[in-house]
Swiss-Prot record:
Residues 22-190 form the FAD-binding PCMH-type domain. The active site is at R169, S220 (proton donor), E290. Belongs to the MurB family. It is found in: Cytoplasm. It comes from Synechococcus sp. (strain RCC307). PANTHER family: UDP-N-ACETYLENOLPYRUVOYLGLUCOSAMINE REDUCTASE (PTHR21071:SF4). Keywords: Cell cycle, Cell division, Cell shape, Cell wall biogenesis/degradation, Cytoplasm, FAD, Flavoprotein, NADP, Oxidoreductase, Peptidoglycan synthesis. Its cofactor is FAD. This is UDP-N-acetylenolpyruvoylglucosamine reductase. Its EC number is 1.3.1.98. Its main location: cytoplasm. InterPro entries: FAD-bd_PCMH, FAD-bd_PCMH-like_sf, FAD-bd_PCMH_sub1, FAD-bd_PCMH_sub2, MurB, MurB_C, MurB_C_sf, Oxid_FAD_bind_N.
């Protein structure tokens, strides 16, 4: 298989280095494009080689199996940058732009609407796909549209917020094989930057004081079964501190599973399934993960049921 040197492809790259849980096997081929043109060239090559392709951002909502991923894995975290108009409140950001960076830049420009996201360890692309949210806010509230790439054809197009069919931690992109390249947001202009700075600082303090930032995690593991909170249900059943291998239900926030230092992806998967089973037995509720599994897991169908 001929690999063009200008694609900067690497072989057998451990993917745990590119997820916030720090677990997962290797990718057959791996690349971090630094421009949209580079990404499109990678997709063109992968399509020509008939390789399965996976796309990741900051890796904060992913559980990659210990066996790794076949084919080509493309990480968008180097596709950074944003442009904003302080008059109209419109801001456009590349898929790999860290969400906290975008939130702080908007706040400094007097643009309100992303303060809730300052503590989320993800990228714009991942946030658009997952309809990320916190502190009562979410991506869908301010998104105008997203520019997406269809890997099967190499074509790009814009999808409006309505087309993305947003719901709680859901978008149409979770079931469509499309890749976010950039996104546009409409924020409230003309707000005092010092007021916005105070809001972002307050939101960040709330997250860092109640969530386990000192250990690798993926963020919230389960969606909240409205009107209840997943973390409260899990804590109420005495599962804080429960371990399987190196995976542990956080003693600080029960909707977080942390890597205590030597966890495998299989440990994370098993603990997720254990928590689901205990909650189901006690309350008759099925907790649905926010985290997306990639690769092969034992009993994966049971876990997703």
């Amino acid at each position: 298989m001929e690999i063009p040197a200008d694609l900067n492809l690497r072989k057998d790259v451990p993917l745990g280095d590119f997820t916030t849980w720090k677990v997962g096997g290797a990718a057959d081929f791996f690349a971090e494009p630094d421009s949209s043109d580079h990404l499109e060239a990678l997709v063109h090559w992968g399509r020509g080689q008939q390789l399965p392709m996976r796309f990741i951002g900051a890796g904060s909502n992913l559980l990659i199996s210990d066996e790794g991923l076949a084919g080509l894995v493309i990480c968008s975290r180097r596709l950074q940058g944003s442009q904003l108009d302080p008059t109209t409140g419109i801001i456009e950001a590349q898929a790999g732009e860290p969400l906290p960076t975008l939130a702080r830049r908007a706040a400094k420009a007097g643009l309100s609407g992303l303060e809730w996201s300052v503590g989320i360890p993800g990228t714009v692309g991942g946030a658009v796909v997952m309809n990320a949210g916190a502190q009562g806010g979410c991506i869908a509230e301010s998104l105008i549209d997203a520019t997406v790439l269809d890997p099967s054809s190499g074509q790009t197009r814009r999808m409006s917020c309505n087309e993305l069919d947003y719901d709680y931690r859901h978008s149409a992109l979770q079931s469509e094989a499309l890749v976010v390249l950039s996104a546009r947001f409409r924020l409230q202009a003309g707000v005092d930057p010092s007021e916005l700075s105070a809001r972002t600082s307050s939101n960040l303090h709330k997250r860092t004081s109640t969530q386990p930032y000192q250990l690798p995690s993926c963020g919230s593991v389960f969606r909240n079964p409205e009107p209840q909170k997943a973390g409260r249900l899990i804590e109420g059943l005495g599962l804080k501190g429960h371990r399987i291998g190196g995976a542990e239900v956080s003693t600080l926030h029960a909707n977080f599973i942390v890597n205590t230092g030597n966890a495998q992806a299989a440990d994370m998967d098993a603990l997720i399934r254990h928590v689901q089973a205990v909650v189901k037995q006690a309350h008759g509720l099925q907790l649905h993960p926010e985290v997306m599994r990639l690769g092969c897991f034992a009993n994966s169908q049971a876990a997703a049921a």
